[in-house]
């Protein structure tokens, strides 16, 4: 529809969100249906073949490169329909190129991807590749708290999940101050007052014992409110990429 209407900004946004979600999927699952995916109705492809992860990354990187060239200030984005950046074309373009950096960093150990040179090109050419410059550029979706614009995880519950042991141990061992933002201290049991996680994938008997002793759950005041924002990417991630790549 965006192509039919020659709306290049909408095309660029669509390519950006496609790269965001499909990169998350291939990071989780590796090889997956890609070229033949989403063609069940149009082409009757009910069992799409799996594509190599390199093929997927190459395609997504090209999508982001194309998206960067499609943005234009000669046409506007309807702010009422843009829940992420309220119609700000410049911020969308910054998000596209910052996401481009993330994907390049993901494959930085693959020499054939030439990530180092491509990342350097982005940082050295801000006019051609604008990227996040402050927290004001963060790709953060804010919810009003009124349905349907509510956080899907916003149920205020505190007792239906437990934090993973490895995650908790890493934060405790490094005295990471963000731990109180992510989760709560154990309220009762042998582990009361501390930050303790559950062993992922452990037998039911082990998990039952750990649960009885007490485990930390997610902090419902920060992540599980109906108005809790959802962040896709931040300025701090761009700074980490810059520190590691240059």
Segments from the language model and where they lie:
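Structured, solvent-exposed acidic/aromatic patches
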Residues: 1-17, 21-246
